UniProtKB/Swiss-Prot annotation:
Its main location: nucleus. InterPro entries: Mad1 (IPR008672). This is Spindle assembly checkpoint component MAD1. The keyword Transcription regulation does not apply. Keywords: Cell cycle, Cell division, Coiled coil, Mitosis, Nucleus.
Amino acid sequence: MSLTPQIKEKPLESLDADQLRRRVLTLQYKYTTLQNEYEISKLSSERETYSLQNKYDKSMNELENALKDTKILYEENIKLKEELKSKDALPKEDEKIITTLRTQVVSLKNEVNLKEQRIVELAHKLSSKQNEVTNAIESMKLEIEGSGNILHQHETQINKHVEEIRYLQQELKEKENLISELRSVQTSASHRNNSTEELQDLAVLNKTLKEQLNYAKELEDMNLKQATELKKLRQNNDVQSLLKKENELLQSKLDQLNSLQKKFESLEMENISLQEKITQWGIVRLDGKFKNPNDVITELNMLQRENTFLLDTNSKLQIDFNQMSMLNDEMAIERNQLLDLNKDYETSILNLKRLNHELEQQKLLSFEECKLLRQQLEEFEEQDDKKKTPGDQVNASNIIEGYKNQTEDLTNELKRLNEELSKTDDKIQKRRKITNDLGISYSQRLNELILENKKLERLLSATKNHANILEQKILDLTSLKEKKVRILQLRDNPLLKEHYIRKEKLALLEKENSDLLSGIETDAIPRSVYDRIKHDMKLLEKEIFSANKKTTRLKEVFNKKSLEFIEAVNSLLGFKLEFLAHGKVKLVSCYQPNKYIIADLQSNTLKSDLDKVIPEWETLFQLYVIEKGELPAFLSQVKLRLWELSQP
């Protein structure tokens, strides 16, 4: 220790190799002594924490026992409450039981007071022990903070010394190199030149080096001892942190004990109030039919059953009422739909009447044309009889017969059209009668339901608002000028289309008729026949084109809707559906796209390769499909298992 001031006074450059080594050893010794001091302080703190831990464990055991006692008292108090509730209506014969219960209550009260006193004592003890523990912990904290500051200072000093040691080691290496060079020079020189003084110096140096080595070994032993003490101090620090946590838990348990004490006081007050009620309420209030407490219990059970039954009936009536209201709403919707259908039928009847009127006009025109044609034919026959030969007469008679056949065909077709129109009129009238009858029956049923319905006011208010809106619209329409009113009609109206086609066909037939009349003298077929056939072909092509267009559109819509349906099923149910041939359906899970389930709806069989993925496949199949016959539940279980397997 006497070497340290000399080392501090001299600079590092002026020191020899021996002095540098001595300085390094002294610094190492200081470092080890500091470490040993820290380990010793840590050991002392560990001992203190161990003693505090023992005290803490004892206090915790006492507190747990107190808590158990309070819980037992609380449960006994609850039992007493229940007994008091059940014995509020006891008969006169049970006064002895009440007296015994009162004595038990008094004894329990005394026990509770004793327990309360014990709890108060334990609380005082715990608070005193807690104060001791907190004081000890605070002192330990202060000691730890002081030791931490000292450690920090020592670490800074040690870092400085380590840097100095490194610098000194470098200088030592240089000095050793110089010494080795000098020794080599000395050995190379002659032994005669060696002086006795140099030999003495070398011997002294050898002795000092041996002493320094022994001193270094002693310092290393001291360092090891201090390291063990440091480990013990660190263990004590960990124990101290555990003690802090346990102290926090103890504080929370103390808070719980305070809350339990408050609960206990409230329960005691309730117990006193219940005793007062027992004294005030008498057995006089009970009916004579209650001879035993069991009678009261049975009566209470009966009343509870009646109450539950009445609640069930009330809920059923409420459900029936809700169903009736829903049925009423549905019937109102059906009535509105029937009214809309009635309006549609009336409009269709008006359209059919218009068509009928037009067809009758066309029929009259065709009859008149037939009459004119017959007159012309008769005149023509008279002229031909006068002019032509018997062969020509035969040809003319054949042509006339053909025309007659055509006219008869036209008349038959007109009759058929009239019959169809009459049939459609009869059907419409029948449907109208049926709808009227249905409307009458529905209206009667609605009237009966509306009388029992509470939503009449809402419907009335809605209808009043609707009526006001309609009246306002009527006023707006009447205020408009006649010039501004325009009747709109569809340009491509089907009625007009049919009328146009019939008109065009009639014109072609008239032209064909006139051409045939003019071409009687010749054997050639007139062009108008070709035009009519061409027109019929165009009409057929248009019909075929529209039918093909409709079918393609229906196919597109069907494909689109089927894809939407499959996507919706896949997103909502987790299975992608693929419809196979022969009534088979392939189910592919979204969690395992490579696996599948094929369900044969005709033979009621399942085929899948999921049994290798799901280990519980056989048990699930046996439980849900074979035993319970619930395929949807089986599929949902499979989906859940696949989802669990897909989770990381």
